[in-house]
From Swiss-Prot:
Transmembrane segments: none annotated. NCBIfam families: PRK00124.1. It comes from Enterobacter sp. (strain 638). InterPro entries: UPF0178. This is UPF0178 protein Ent638_0858. PANTHER family: UPF0178 PROTEIN YAII. Signal peptide: none annotated.
Amino acid sequence: MAIWVDADACPNVIKEILFRAAERVQMPLTLVANQSLRIPPSKFIRSMRVPAGFDVADNEIVRLCNPEDLVITADIPLAAEVLEKGAAALNPRGERYSPSTIRQILTMRDFMDTLRASGVQTGGPDTLSQRDRQQFAAELDKWLLEVKRRTA
């Protein structure tokens, strides 16, 4: 089991939470991005640089992740693809995607894209709050505990 991060847009504070968790539980953590990333020295943490381009990092994560891995992403289509492979998906705000909710979330995303394409100003997401960070850490710990129980 491993944790994969769609790292180009992942907030630094979330990366820091992931770095500490990977060290604490000694689990492989890979940050995938199309730019160089700073990571702490660790035998559990690595970065993977991919060429720039549309969905290149996403496609690499889908290719490399395995069932029961965890993928950290705010990219809803990527979350849908890794769920189909049997991996778990968690966004940086602490929302865990599930097979039962991902279709509805994809539909809402597509609807918002249509609105934006027609000129409607929809605004972006709120800045990451302390509550979001706490929710992310709690959901990450919950997943790590599930993994520990399955492998015990």
